[in-house]
């Protein structure tokens, strides 16, 4: 599919800010001020009601290995963006949705998964940020979970992350074989009990690659429990990052939406 993530009048969200028209800027200001007055639940409900006007760009079918090669060709043709070298600091805004929270809550585990899993890994060859560099993400990172969709995520956050945030030593077997989680998975709308582990593993590469991960605007206690550093503003985050990358770092911003694959040279 293409990258038309937002219909009118929200298409400005998929544009680079310097491309905004006067109308776009007006819509942004009006939307921001309105959203700031609403409770989180209402804001989520409004965002999830937006239907993307996606269109199909290609269809592949047949033998898996052959289809995979052809699919990659089309993905690279559509999404590949050439980037000149790695950066010291990578900034990115984490959206309100991920593959695992449609009509649901973007909980702290999914913030980690979306940032250090999906967005960090959207590259070919090597990551946008150098090894030992700093990743700065912006997201409110509320300690909020959907009890029907993500019951094991709640326990993962309270129980597992209180013990460790190193996926190599986590207690996956207990969650995978828990009968109550299995029951909810089979009879309700819950993800499997082991799902938060896989979400965490998906972000583990980015977590291990970066020298420091900072979340701007996140609830401080929640951010620290994830193993990251909280910051109130982007300026604060850059000051914190200077301890890792020095006072004159290179900075790259991954603008989402749209979706891209960085081809780092």
PLM regions and their residue ranges:
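A short, acidic, amphipathic alpha-helical segment used as a generic capping/interface helix at domain edges
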Residues: 66-82, 117-125, 189-207, 232-244
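Flexible loop/turn segments at secondary-structure boundaries
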Residues: 97-101, 143-148, 221-224, 259-262
């Amino acid at each position: 599919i293409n990258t038309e993530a937002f219909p009118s009048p929200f298409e400005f969200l998929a544009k680079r800010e310097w491309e905004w028209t006067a109308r776009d800027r007006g819509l942004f200001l009006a939307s921001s001020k309105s959203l700031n007055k609403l409770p989180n639940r209402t804001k989520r409900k409004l965002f999830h009601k937006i239907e993307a006007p996606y269109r199909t760009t290609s269809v592949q079918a047949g033998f898996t290995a052959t289809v995979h090669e052809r699919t990659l060709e089309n993905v690279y043709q559509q999404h590949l963006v050439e980037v000149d070298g790695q950066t010291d600091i990578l900034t990115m805004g984490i959206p309100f949705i991920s593959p695992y929270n449609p009509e649901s809550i973007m909980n702290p585990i999914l913030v980690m998964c979306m940032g250090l899993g999906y967005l960090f890994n959207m590259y070919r060859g090597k990551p946008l940020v150098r090894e030992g560099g700093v990743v700065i993400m912006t997201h409110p990172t509320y300690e909020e979970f959907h009890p029907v969709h993500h019951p094991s995520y709640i326990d993962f956050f309270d129980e597992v992350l209180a013990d460790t945030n190193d996926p190599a030593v986590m207690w996956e077997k207990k969650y995978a074989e828990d009968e109550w989680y299995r029951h909810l998975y089979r009879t309700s709308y819950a993800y499997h009990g082991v799902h938060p582990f896989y979400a965490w593993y998906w972000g583990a590469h980015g977590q291990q690659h970066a020298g420091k991960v900072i979340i701007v605007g996140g609830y401080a206690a929640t951010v620290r429990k994830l193993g990251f550093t909280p910051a109130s503003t982007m300026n604060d985050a850059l000051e914190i990052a200077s301890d890792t990358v020095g006072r004159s770092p290179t900075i790259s911003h991954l603008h989402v939406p749209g979706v891209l694959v960085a081809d780092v040279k």
